[in-house]
Amino acid sequence: MPACFECNNGFSSDEKYVSCFLDVLKESVYQGYTRRADTSKRLSDDIDLSNLIAEQIKLIDGKVKFAVDANKLRRILLKLAQGHAGYEFDHINFDNSNITIWYEFAFNLSLDMVQEFEEIPQMDIMPEVGSRISVTPFILQNVETGEALAFMLWNEVQEDQYRYQVFYNEAGGVSVKIVIYELLYARIDFDLG
């Protein structure tokens, strides 16, 4: 996905914020989880970021209270989704697409909601020949009828840290699902109509 120098580097501080925020939040919510070493280093190297996150994630009366910077989070989710969709489906023009960004934290999701989110969608249509995703679907074939079905599996980039899935949605647009630290669940829909 091409990007000018300014655009590509303009996300750095937001990416650092989102990564550190999510890791610190996970450590605050889940006993037994210890934040990553690179998160601790980033926070010790950037006192302003450390203070900001300490202000946004607090333990009050035994409960974790937090307030994420939704603009930064949405901006990073959109950047990631555009990159994944462009990588998997080759060329997609996002310029005039309507975009819907949904996200929620694991501790706010029911088991049914997680299972629905985790579903592996069947691909009824395939992207253009030559795109990465046109050679990576999981194909199941009924040996009796010969009927074949294609499914889009999750791409696990870092185990328990980051994974994503790209597929055509029910409306004919492109959807990208992202899970970060097994804490943040996000779905970004692009209506390409």
What does each of the following model-derived ranges do?
Residues 70-193:
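C-terminal, charged low-complexity interaction regions
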